[in-house]
Amino acid sequence: MVTIRLARHGAKKRPFYQVVVTDSRNARNGRFIERVGFFNPIANGAEEETRLDLDRIAHWVGQGATVSDRVAALIKAANKAA
């Protein structure tokens, strides 16, 4: 099953997440099909906290991809801000 979820990157105690489309059987930071955005939970100042390609996310959801709870919350916040 294809899912849209977060892959953790960054340094210890400084997480940075990529929003990726991947097979649910792959490891959290493993192989992915497409990168559709990022989320920086510790962004400050002029740094961008979230960037999502909502068109590609809609495409993958239309293809049957499931969305993780956290990514669904990020999408909801992005739609609210736009």
Curated annotation (Swiss-Prot):
Keywords on record: Ribonucleoprotein, Ribosomal protein
Kindly give the Pfam families that the UniProt entry links to this protein. Ribosomal_S16 (PF00886)
Give this protein's Gene Ontology molecular function annotations: structural constituent of ribosome
> Which GO biological process annotations does it have?
translation
NADP is among the record's keywords: no
Return the InterPro entries for the record.
Ribosomal_bS16 (IPR000307), Ribosomal_bS16_CS (IPR020592), Ribosomal_bS16_dom_sf (IPR023803)
One cellular component term (GO) for this entry is: cytoplasm
Member of which family?
Belongs to the bacterial ribosomal protein bS16 family.
User: What is this protein's name?
Assistant: Small ribosomal subunit protein bS16
> What gene is it encoded by?
rpsP
